[in-house]
Amino acid sequence: MAPTTATKDDSGYGDERRRELQAFDDTKLGVKGLVDSGVKSIPSIFHHPPEALSDIISPAPLPSSPPSGAAIPVVDLSVTRREDLVEQVRHAAGTVGFFWLVNHGVAEELMGGMLRGVRQFNEGPVEAKQALYSRDLARNLRFASNFDLFKAAAADWRDTLFCEVAPNPPPREELPEPLRNVMLEYGAAVTKLARFVFELLSESLGMPSDHLYEMECMQNLNVVCQYYPPCPEPHRTVGVKRHTDPGFFTILLQDGMGGLQVRLGNNGQSGGCWVDIAPRPGALMVNIGDLLQLVTNDRFRSVEHRVPANKSSDTARVSVASFFNTDVRRSERMYGPIPDPSKPPLYRSVRARDFIAKFNTIGLDGRALDHFRL
C-alpha cells in the first residue's frame, strides 16, 4: 500500500510551510506559473523524502524471466469471438490490473483534439486558468494544482483541469475555449467504450453482461486532464506519487512522451517491481479501480502506479484520465463483495460517497481501500 499520510502535527507542517503552500495556491497559476517565472530550483513544498524517491529515479528493469503478469496485455476489440475477449479481460483484470485497448472505436481526431486542447489551455492565457482555479470539490469544472495540496506531505509537479462530464456536465460555453468543441464529444465516445468494457468485465465474472452497469458503476464520468511541466530538479519530486484509483475503472489517454510507471508482480502491491510503460500510439489504457477490486472481492486488482517528474527541458507531458464511478452525490447503494460461495467477503459494504470521501480526506499518500478491509 502507499505510505500513510502524515498529519499536520507530524509531517513538518508549520506556520512557514503553510504560508508557502498558501502563497503558491494564491497565484492560481499552478506549477506552470513557477516554470514561467524561470525557477531554477523547485520550492521546498515539492521536495519528497529520499526514501520516496529512491526507486523512482531508476525503476527496476523487467527481469529476464518476468513474474507472472509482468507485461501490459493488449486487448484487440476487433476480435470477433466474444469468448476470447472475455478471457483476455478476465486475465488482465485479475493479474496486472491494466490493459491496453486497440481498435476501440474512439476516433483519433477526438483523442488528438483532447491532447492538443489540454496543452493549449495550460499554455494559453493565464487569465483563463485563474478564472477556473478552485479547491471546491463540488464544482463540476475547475483548475488546480494538487487536489490534496494542503494534506499531502509533499506536493507533486503537475497541474490539473477537472471536468464532470456525467451526470452534471458544465454548459459548453463554460468550457475552456481550446476544449469547447471536443471535451463533451470525447466524453461520449469513452462512455460508449466503457459500457462495452463493463460488459466484458461482467461476463468475465460469470455474470450477465449488464450486471455491473445495473449496479450503477458508470453513472459518473470525471475527465481529469493532467499537465506535467518540465521540472528543473526532477530528482527531488514526482509528477504523481504512487497511488491506486478509487473508482471502478479508468480509461487513460496519453501523449507520446511516456512517463507512466506501474508496479508489476505480486499483484501490484509491495514487493512488485516498478516498470516504465512505453506509450502505444492510438491505444487507450484501462486500469481497474479500488471499488471494482472491492465488489469483485479481489478477483480484479487495482494496482499502484505513478508518474515521475518531467525531465524534459522544454516540453510538457499531457494525459487525460476518464474516471468511471457511480453518482456519488445521489446514490445510496451499498457496495460490497459480490457473493461467492467459495470465498468469504474480504471487505465491508460501503456507499461510494463514503469511499470517495475517505479518498479525498487522505489524498494520494494513503489508500482508501485498506480502510474497508475486514
Curated annotation (Swiss-Prot):
Expressed in seedlings and newly formed crown roots. Highest expression in the scutellar node. Low to non detectable levels in cob, tassel and mature organs like husk or leaves. Optimum pH is 6.0. It is found in: Cytoplasm. It catalyses: DIBOA beta-D-glucoside + 2-oxoglutarate + O2 = TRIBOA beta-D-glucoside + succinate + CO2. Residues 214-326 form the Fe2OG dioxygenase domain. It is an enzyme of class 1 (oxidoreductase). Binds 1 Fe(2+) ion per subunit. The keyword Amino-acid biosynthesis does not apply. Its main location: cytoplasm. Keywords: Cytoplasm, Dioxygenase, Iron, Metal-binding, Oxidoreductase. Can use 2,4-dihydroxy-2H-1,4-benzoxazin-3(4H)-one 2-D-glucoside (DIBOA-glucoside) as substrate, but not aglucone DIBOA. This is DIBOA-glucoside dioxygenase BX6. It comes from Zea mays. The lineage of its organism: Eukaryota, Viridiplantae, Streptophyta, Embryophyta, Tracheophyta.
